[in-house]
Design a protein with these regions (language model features):
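Bacterial N-terminal signal peptides that target proteins for export
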Residues: 3-13
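Bacterial N-terminal signal peptides
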Residues: 13-22
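Glycan-recognition patch characteristic of GH18 chitinases/ENGases
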Residues: 30-168, 333-352, 356, 434
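Surface-exposed amphipathic alpha-helices with a cationic face
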Residues: 31-34, 112-129, 133-134, 197-214, ...
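Extracellular low-complexity, Gly/Ser/Thr-rich intrinsically disordered linkers
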Residues: 46, 356-442
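Conserved, mostly hydrophobic/aromatic
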Residues: 68, 130, 183, 203, ...
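Substrate-binding surface in catalytic domains of secreted glycosidases
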Residues: 81-106, 189-355
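An active-site-proximal structural segment forming one wall of the substrate-binding cleft
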Residues: 148-181, 199-202, 206, 231-242
Length: 442
């Protein structure tokens, strides 16, 4: 027909390509909206809790994970810091660590590293990060290395060689084990503020350079604190720009050093909190991070799989906001009585695996709910669960399925990136609380 223009073959081809690209981009955008779920695994936990990488497979948790975060690798102290494996026996030498797949380990790589490689073969989507540092780590290595460009470059090169390239020991290689890093420097001081950002930038630059050779995408994240006194020395916007996401503590709002009982992981504050002036909440932390320039999609909210507890607490207000005398004692895991000998070197059988006064695993807490003199109470205003035993004067604060449901709804509503748990092995055998978090993120 006169005046009509018939599409040329090249135009058709281009149009088809654009359609395909459009579909691809939409698919990627849909993937981006899926919430991240991460979980920390303690290297030493196999000794105390008996929790192994194989348990991730047995409980069907592995299939739910975006990231498994292995805690911890060391940054050595001194003038020339380097990365090293904290516990070589647990990491790769112990042949008694249960196999994940049922197949024997390939010598000389045993232990947790051998088990993680088997887990990744069963779950190709799973990415594994090595967390460097930790609460008990010596921060002097971070400080020394971060002060100069040469020091930063040397430390990062050491960490990549050991963990990402997998040169874990002479004659022992663990290729394709770790997909990146979770930096857990607790915590930078005011003098470290710029150096911390520069160190993250060096990690990002060297990982990007490695990508040019391997064509693999490497993940960089850092663990960031809940309380202002700890995050005030981090340039949150600049630091967040260097990483894929932040694991931001959703706990530590109350702890062993407190003089009055409080909630350790509250979502909100409340006007009737008599400790309001010295308290904080997850909501306040989220708002502070976002106001500082951290993208909501990079914010991963932390969930504790443990309880914080005290004793010598008077029978007032369910034990909440009361003066305390001491940390709660270590109990047997079934909650029936005290652990006779909670020494970590040679504990009595059947004790709560944390073996630490002032703490209990969620697994043990479940055995106390409305049992053995304990009465459960839920703070709907602040969104937190508590247990109190009036006769013993013992009080615990923790997360339960109700608080998890509200917190995960908050994550969805505020378009946060997702969530993570500290730490695997503290949930019950079925991973009930962990699975509740996963379900709530959907």
């Amino acid at each position: 027909m006169t005046g009509s223009v018939r599409p040329r073959p090249i135009q058709v081809a281009l149009l088809s390509l654009l359609v395909l690209l459009g579909c691809y981009c939409r698919s990627e955008a849909q993937d981006d909206h899926r919430k991240i779920f991460g979980a920390y695994f303690e290297e030493w936990g196999t000794r105390y809790s008996g929790y192994n990488i194989a348990d991730l497979e047995k409980s069907n948790i592995a299939d739910q994970l975006t990231y498994l975060i292995y805690a911890f690798g060391n940054v050595t102290p001194g003038a020339t810091p380097a990365c090293e494996i904290a516990d070589p026996v647990a990491a790769f030498r112990d042949p008694s660590v249960p196999s994940v797949s049922g197949k024997p380990y390939v010598s000389p790589l045993y232990g947790n590293f051998g088990a993680i490689l088997q887990l990744k073969q069963l779950h190709p989507h799973l990415k594994v990060l090595i967390s460097l540092g930790g609460q008990l780590g010596d921060a002097s290595g971070w400080v020394a290395a971060s002060q100069t460009s040469a020091g930063r470059a040397a430390l990062v090169a050491s960490c990549i060689n050991t963990f990402v390239k997998g040169n874990v020991a002479p004659g022992v290689q663990a290729r394709n084990l770790f997909d990146g890093f979770n930096i857990d420097w607790e915590f930078p001081s005011a003098a470290d503020k710029e150096n911390f950002t520069a160190l993250l930038g060096e990690f990002r630059a060297q990982l990007n350079e490695l990508t040019k050779t391997t064509h693999n995408k490497y993940i960089l994240s850092f663990d960031s604190p809940a309380l202002r006194k700890d995050y005030v020395n981090i340039d949150l916007k600049a630091a967040a720009a260097q990483v894929d996401f932040l694991t931001i503590d959703g706990y530590d709002y109350a702890g062993p050093s407190d003089k009055e009982t409080n909630e350790a992981s509250p979502l909100y504050e409340a006007d009737n909190n008599p400790l309001r002036a010295e308290s904080s909440s997850i909501d306040e932390t989220v708002k502070a991070y976002l106001a500082a320039g951290v993208p909501a999609g990079k914010y991963l909210m932390g969930f504790p799989l443990y309880a914080v507890g005290w004793t010598g607490v008077p029978n007032v207000n369910h034990g909440l906001y009361q003066h305390l005398k001491d940390l709660s004692p270590v109990l047997l895991a079934d909650g029936s009585s005290l652990c006779p000998h909670p020494d970590k070197a040679s504990p009595s059988p059947g004790c709560d695996p944390l073996l630490a006064a002032g703490f209990l695993t969620y697994s043990t807490i479940e055995n106390l709910i409305n049992k053995n003199g304990f009465v459960a109470w839920f703070d709907a205003a602040r969104v937190g669960a508590t247990l109190y035993n009036p006769a013993a004067g013992t009080f615990y604060t923790f997360d339960n399925p109700t608080s998890v449901a509200t917190k995960t709804a908050y994550i969805r509503k505020n378009k946060l990136g997702g969530a993570y748990v500290w730490v695997l092995g503290q949930d019950d055998a079925n991973g009930s609380l962990t699975k509740a978090i996963v379900a709530g993120l959907q």
